[in-house]
Design a protein with these regions (language model features):
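Residue-level "edge-of-site" marker
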Residues: 71, 384-385
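N-terminal amphipathic, basic helical "cap/leader" segment at the start of enzyme domains
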Residues: 2-132, 137, 148, 295, ...
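Conserved beta-strand/loop scaffold segments within soluble protein domains that form the structured core
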Residues: 9, 24, 118-376, 386, ...
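Generic hydrophobic-segment detector
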Residues: 49, 60-62, 324, 365, ...
Length: 436
């Protein structure tokens, strides 16, 4: 894809047909394919991702210790409030949910006994089960059969200042047959939140769901996104994570009808002390479906930590599957770390294609030297590299207002980078002449 951005991505583009995992980092990243997983019951490894425990019952999930596969990168002590480690439930009232919807879309507030809730799948870990067990009411957004939303649906999940008790929020986005809509979910303010977002796309529906995590510093957020696609449905699922102290997003995607397509797009920027974690599971459970997942992140500052885990399962029945997942991380300063783990499990040889790639690299000093040698100031050169790194994915979001906001947020992050470098790093020397 041609984006018009400068060719300044410091990481080599992996070849999709190889499915190899590339690690370009030194001590800041680990990229590996794991053949076993742990669902928390005594740390017993599973032979298949399909064997992972999924249950609506919180008692089925012990409080994690950090030794479990599912939690090995997470700061479980800091996440304790949203894991309901005390067994008291996430009963606070620290968040408000507001919705602005076009006339083609209906919004309801329903009790937890509504039959539509839980249809997108079951919780897959302790945080998801705690959020499910604790919510009292759900906000249900429905796009009617064959309806086309005239403008994006805006959902705002806002933390209430001064209310630090852990709370739970439940949202359901339901796209009926042959409908089309864009839904933007914005998370802002202070919060200690366990969240469930269910996305149901019925046959032939086309749905874009954008979840933006732009919390205040100190926020704790664990969110389970459960996505179910019917026959010929298309879902573009976008995750943008910028704010919060600890944010952990776990999208689970299930295909239930042939011909469906899922696009997963993720962008994140971790600053000093932040832990931003994204764990995906794409379950190809029926034939002839397609999935594409691409996440990119940048990190800067001491203690900045980004985690990406992408699990793809192609079941024996899912012949004709076409899947590919990619994760890239750009480490801008010392003291930051990115962990990237792509996993691909294939139970049938009759597929269209399957592959994954992971790359993590430091800021390329040679490339910076090259740009500066051609008269580009260091600050501008660094901006060009980072803008080029994110440009293609930003254009894939498909929501201009979100794209503009993200570009502005990246500029703010780059200002922080420049300020930090100005205080600790002397300017690099540039030769007076460079041979053509």
């Amino acid at each position: 894809m041609t984006t018009g951005a400068p060719t300044t991505d410091p990481l080599t583009t992996p070849e999709p047909e190889t499915g190899m995992t590339t690690d370009l980092s030194t001590d800041h990243s680990r990229a590996q394919a794991d053949a076993a997983h742990s669902h928390g019951r005594g740390g017993v490894p599973e032979a298949s991702r399909a064997a992972r425990l999924a249950s609506f019952d919180l008692a089925d999930f012990p409080v994690p210790t950090g030794r479990e596969e599912e939690w090995r990168f997470a700061p479980v002590d800091r996440l304790a409030p949203v894991l309901d480690a005390a067994g008291e439930g996430l009963t606070g009232s620290g968040t408000l949910v507001t919705v602005v919807n076009p006339p083609e879309v209906t919004v309801e507030i329903v009790g937890r006994d509504d039959a539509r809730l839980g249809t997108a799948g079951r919780p897959g870990d302790r945080a998801a089960a705690a959020a499910w067990a604790s919510f009292r009411e759900s906000t249900v957004v429905t796009i009617g059969r064959e309806a086309v939303a005239s403008e994006p649906v805006s959902i705002r999940v806002e933390g209430v200042p001064g209310n630090g008790d852990p709370s739970a929020v439940h949202l359901l986005v339901h796209a009926r047959e042959l409908s089309e809509a864009i839904v933007v979910i914005d998370h802002v303010g202070p919060a200690v939140l366990g969240e469930t977002i269910e996305v149901v796309a019925e046959d032939g529906a086309h749905l874009t769901v954008v979840s933006i995590q732009d919390w205040d510093g100190g926020a704790l957020h664990a969110a389970s996104h459960r996505v179910r696609l019917g026959r010929d449905a298309h879902v573009r699922h976008v995750v943008v994570t910028l704010g919060g102290e600890v944010v952990r997003i776990t999208p689970d995607v299930e295909f239930t009808g042939e011909g469906a397509e899922f696009e997963g797009v993720g962008l994140y920027f971790a600053d000093a002390g932040q832990h931003l974690e994204h764990r995906l599971f794409v379950d190809h459970a029926v034939p002839s479906c397609r999935s594409r997942v691409a996440y990119k992140g940048a990190l800067q500052g001491a203690g900045a930590h980004a985690v990406w885990v992408g699990d793809v399962l192609i079941r024996a029945i899912a012949e004709g599957t076409d899947t590919y997942e990619l994760n890239r991380n750009l480490v801008l300063t010392d003291g930051a770390r990115a962990d990237s783990v792509p996993n691909l499990e294939i139970e049938t040889g009759v597929i269209e294609g399957a592959g994954h790639a992971s790359a993590t690299g430091r800021f390329d000093d040679e490339q910076l030297f090259y740009l500066r040698a051609r008269g580009i100031p260091e600050e501008d050169a660094r901006r060009l590299v980072v803008r080029g790194f994110f440009a293609e994915l930003i254009q894939q979001i498909g929501v201009p207002a979100v794209e503009e906001r993200l570009i502005a947020a990246i500029e703010v992050e780059l200002e922080r980078t420049m300020s930090a470098l100005a205080t600790v790093t002397p300017a690099a020397e540039v030769p007076a002449e460079v041979a053509p």
